[in-house]
Amino acid sequence: MRVILLGAPGAGKGTQAKFITEKFGIPQVSTGDMLRAAVKAETELGLKAKSVMDSGGLVSDDLIIGLIKDRLAEPDCANGVLFDGFPRTIPQAEALLNAGLEIDHVLEIAVDDEEIVKRMSGRRVHEGSGRIYHTIFNPPKVEGIDDVTGEPLLQRKDDVEETVRHRLSVYHAQTKPLVEFYSKLEAKNGKPKCSHIPGVGSVEDITAKVLKALS
């Protein structure tokens, strides 16, 4: 079973990815991890990718597809794979298709932008311990102060509202065409099965919807 999992930053994609990989015994594959592993192993593709990255270039889709083919040939991918952060663009989705790498499921965890902004911009972190609070959902006893040490809490740059909104706009610009691409493919070929899963509610509720979509 080959699954593409889509979801905006803060939509809870990581939690569901963990569930899917454990439930179905398939690895989560990200292009970043694959690139790092190939460069470290000094494979032919890894060396090509390294020379491109060292010169400040972007690794081509053809090279990424080559890495994916190599990765899918490994024994732990025998039952399938969960793609994380790939494809991001229509050319990448077309390259997957042209390489004969069929996808069985495309899941999108969908959460309203304002809900994501609320989730992420309210996060506060205690730098020393990594403890995470939230101004609304999990506030510290004293505003802006870590419960244990009494030290100040920080807001990560990634969680600043302006940054969150920018990341969301990038996500939508990339993902909307992808969802349309796979929906048309499903209408034409009956595959992949495309599912739009509301990402609001308890983790258990969302997981149940994911499981139903994959069954």
From Swiss-Prot:
Chain sites annotated for binding ATP: 10-15, 123, 132-133, 201
PANTHER family, per the entry: NUCLEOTIDE KINASE (PTHR23359)
SUPFAM superfamilies: P-loop containing nucleoside triphosphate hydrolases
Quaternary structure, from the entry: Monomer.
Record-level GO cellular component terms: cytoplasm
Region of interest called LID, as start-end residue ranges on this chain: 122-159
Name of the protein described by the UniProt record: Adenylate kinase
This protein's UniProt keywords: ATP-binding, Cytoplasm, Kinase, Nucleotide biosynthesis, Nucleotide-binding, Transferase
Reaction(s) catalysed (UniProt annotation): AMP + ATP = 2 ADP
The species this protein was found in: Pseudomonas syringae pv. syringae (strain B728a)
Cellular location(s): Cytoplasm
Domain notes: Consists of three domains, a large central CORE domain and two small peripheral domains, NMPbind and LID, which undergo movements during catalysis. The LID domain closes over the site of phosphoryl transfer upon ATP binding. Assembling and dissambling the active center during each catalytic cycle provides an effective means to prevent ATP hydrolysis.
